[in-house]
Design a protein with these regions (language model features):
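General detector of N-terminal leader/presequence modules that precede the first folded domain
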Residues: 1-28
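A generic structural motif
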Residues: 1-3, 48-52, 102-105
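Short amphipathic alpha-helical segments
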Residues: 8-16, 55, 113, 117
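Hydrophobic, Leu/Ile/Phe/Ala-enriched alpha-helical segments that form helix-helix packing faces
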Residues: 16-24, 63-67, 125
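A broadly conserved sequence feature marking short terminus-proximal activation segments
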Residues: 32-85, 123
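Cys/His-clustered metal-coordination modules, chiefly Zn-binding fingers
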Residues: 68-128
Length: 128
């Protein structure tokens, strides 16, 4: 099953949405917040990405990496239905919040107990 929401997750999302807007240099012209069994998702629609998708992804990765709390984020930049990846920019893959290996590798191998991952995420959210 899906994980349950974590207390204060909305506050964390709102903080990083604001930080993204500030670093991008403009506010989104439309936003939405989706909450379901899988968790919480903030969607922001910004103008001007078509011409500067690499900069948008670099802003996103910087937020994901700039603080321990940012490690819980997964910011996707999608333009015309195409997701811009870290590898598209020659950036390293996201690291695991528990051991530092690549997150995809740990997920694929199920290297960590769900309870350990959830506890780490909870701790990071509580620091926001």
């Amino acid at each position: 099953g899906y994980p349950n929401r974590i207390k204060h997750d909305c506050r964390a999302i709102e903080k990083f949405a604001l930080l993204f807007s500030l670093r991008w240099g403009s506010d989104p012209f439309r936003t939405d917040m989706i909450s379901n069994e899988a968790g919480l998702c903030w969607i922001g629609f910004f103008r001007g990405w078509g011409s500067d998708t690499q900069r948008a992804k670099k802003v996103a990765v910087d937020l994901e990496e700039c603080s321990p709390e940012g490690r819980i984020l997964d910011i996707d930049i999608i333009v015309c239905g195409k997701s811009i990846s870290r590898s598209d920019l020659g950036l390293p893959a996201r690291s695991c919040i528990l051991c530092g290996r690549t997150a995809k590798e740990c997920a694929r191998e199920m290297s960590h107990a769900y309870s350990d991952l959830r506890a780490a995420v909870k701790k990071l959210i509580q620091n926001i």
